[in-house]
């Protein structure tokens, strides 16, 4: 009482009510649990329970080894790449007999393959006794122009002799798929290594013999991105 006037007193936050107090208790409990978990995790890290892996040895822990495209291609070239090309190879004259001037329309015929993102199909082909009519070793992408036995049409058939473009070999292999690689970089590196293999193991040994008038036997792949040109990347190349 103060001067005869009654004064009421309430505890702090009492106006929130019982429900409000309970909600605050739950919130505080959650915060406490979160804090405890953070402290525990920090303690685990500081006690040496996490294995430290040296740079370059991450694969020992993750199981994913460093990708080496050169080793990968070397391991499959003689045992898988060449055998598949030789098995699927179609004589260029057979292709020209049916699709001369409309090579982009072949699709899956002749075991044509392409990647999901690609617009054009790739094919394994062969030639025997094809005469070299022109040699270009000066251009950035060197080629020899070949005369296909029995063919008199306008389609130009060439064989790459370095440097090399396109990915027809990689993309025509049934056992190589983009999903098998970690990223686009590795996918591209495999193609680069394949073209390096072509240079060292296929073209270089016969490079000096590539001259007008010589005849060649070859097995290789090409991408049908033109209706009147076949540019072959060889996996087997013999010069006579």
Predicted segments with their positions:
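OB-fold and OB-like single-stranded nucleic-acid-recognition modules
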Residues: 32, 49-240
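Sec-dependent bacterial lipoprotein signal peptides
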Residues: 4-9, 13-47
